[in-house]
């Protein structure tokens, strides 16, 4: 699984970096030629894209290193750090756009030949949609937080390019403040995306539990298994591609130790079939030692 994960995530990071670099060169020319503040917004965003995608590429390679004596749970948390760094990059670009947009609202400047800007923006829009589609497929296959953060960023780029097209069209017909107004709106949306991304990264670093639906699946697998009378103390988290799952099984007091171990092994394999690559720890408890109030399963 780790080889497939690493290959897909690395390809996603390389594709994002290559596309952002190519679009940056095109946008530099378009901004120089038209003077559009909306295109400047897109240019700044491309700079952030490159920095974020390069960070992803380096961090993903580090996160895929196997566990060692100093990092016995692996290096998957590096992905969350990359997502947090991206949120900081994006917040900085949003603040820059705020200042530039306000300045152009106060003193609007007519742009040169909006048609060039429209052509460049259409190219950027098509390329970004293709990239986001590929990233969404990678996220569905790997659940990589770093690629998900990158995808959220490029999804905001799709909306941004659409807004730029409208702004350039309005400017073409003489409404010069539209350029700055749309750039300001883009900045607000980018900042919102950055804050959401940062929140998700922090939650991962704080070892947030797996989603309720996944935990319920684990509970259903465990409690329906022959030989298991009940279960409690389910604890879960995720680091990079690896889910960490801990659970206590409740078994009959007179069940031989070898048989209890065999049942636990079967339950572990069933969980791994549903969540491949997980790190599963199962503890067996005799029913008589489990407090009555602890037998009711809750998602904790």
From Swiss-Prot:
Keyword Glycosyltransferase found: no
A biological process term (GO) from this entry: intracellular zinc ion homeostasis
Subunit text: Homodimer.
Localization (cell): Cell inner membrane
Transmembrane segment boundaries: 24-44, 82-102, 114-134, 156-176, 178-198
Stored Pfam families: Cation_efflux, ZT_dimer
Name the record gives this protein: Cation-efflux pump FieF
Gene3D superfamilies registered for this protein in UniProt: Cation efflux protein transmembrane domain (1.20.1510.10), Cation efflux protein, cytoplasmic domain (3.30.70.1350)
Organism listed in the record: Salmonella schwarzengrund (strain CVM19633)
NCBIfam families xref list: CDF, PRK09509.1
Domain of life assignment: Bacteria
Catalysis performed (reactions): Zn(2+)(in) + H(+)(out) = Zn(2+)(out) + H(+)(in); Cd(2+)(in) + H(+)(out) = Cd(2+)(out) + H(+)(in); Fe(2+)(in) + H(+)(out) = Fe(2+)(out) + H(+)(in)
Keyword terms: Cell inner membrane, Cell membrane, Ion transport, Iron, Iron transport, Membrane, Metal-binding, Transmembrane, Transmembrane helix, Transport, Zinc, Zinc transport
UniProt signal peptide: none
Recorded topology in the membrane: Multi-pass membrane protein
Function, as annotated: Divalent metal cation transporter which exports Zn(2+), Cd(2+) and possibly Fe(2+). May be involved in zinc and iron detoxification by efflux.
One Gene Ontology MF term: metal ion binding
Residues reported to bind Zn(2+): 45, 49, 153, 157
Annotated PANTHER family: CATION-EFFLUX PUMP FIEF, MITOCHONDRIAL METAL TRANSPORTER 1-RELATED
Keyword Transmembrane: yes
Gene (name only): fieF
One cellular component (GO) term of this entry: plasma membrane
Family indicated by similarity: Belongs to the cation diffusion facilitator (CDF) transporter (TC 2.A.4) family. FieF subfamily.
């Amino acid at each position: 699984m780790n080889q497939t994960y690493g290959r897909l995530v690395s390809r996603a990071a390389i594709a994002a970096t290559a596309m952002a670099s190519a679009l940056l060169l095109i946008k530099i020319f378009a901004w120089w030629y038209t003077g559009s503040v909306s295109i400047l917004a897109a240019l700044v965003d491309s700079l952030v894209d490159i920095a974020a995608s390069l960070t992803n590429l380096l961090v993903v390679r580090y996160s895929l290193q196997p566990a060692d004596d100093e990092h016995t749970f692996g290096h998957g948390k590096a992905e969350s750090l990359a997502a947090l760094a991206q949120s900081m990059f994006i917040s900085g670009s949003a603040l820059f756009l705020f200042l530039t947009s306000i300045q152009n609202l106060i003193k609007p400047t007519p742009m040169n030949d909006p048609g060039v800007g429209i052509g460049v923006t259409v190219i950027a829009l098509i390329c970004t949609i293709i990239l986001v589609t590929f990233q969404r497929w990678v996220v569905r296959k790997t659940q990589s937080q770093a690629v998900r953060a990158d995808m959220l960023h490029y999804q905001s780029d799709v909306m941004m390019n659409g807004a730029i097209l409208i702004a350039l069209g309005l400017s073409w017909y003489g409404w010069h403040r539209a350029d700055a107004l749309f750039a300001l709106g883009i900045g607000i949306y980018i900042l919102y995306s950055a804050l959401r991304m940062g929140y998700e990264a922090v939650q991962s670093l704080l070892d947030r539990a797996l989603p309720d639906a996944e935990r319920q699946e684990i509970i259903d697998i465990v409690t329906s298994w022959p030989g298991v009378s009940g279960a409690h103390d389910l604890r879960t988290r995720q680091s990079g591609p690896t889910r960490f799952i801990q659970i206590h099984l409740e078994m009959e007091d007179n069940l031989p130790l070898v048989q209890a171990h065999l049942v636990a092994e079967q339950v572990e394999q069933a969980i791994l079939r549903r969540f491949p690559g997980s790190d599963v720890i199962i503890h067996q408890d005799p029913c008589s030692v489990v407090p009555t109030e602890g037998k009711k399963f809750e998602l904790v």
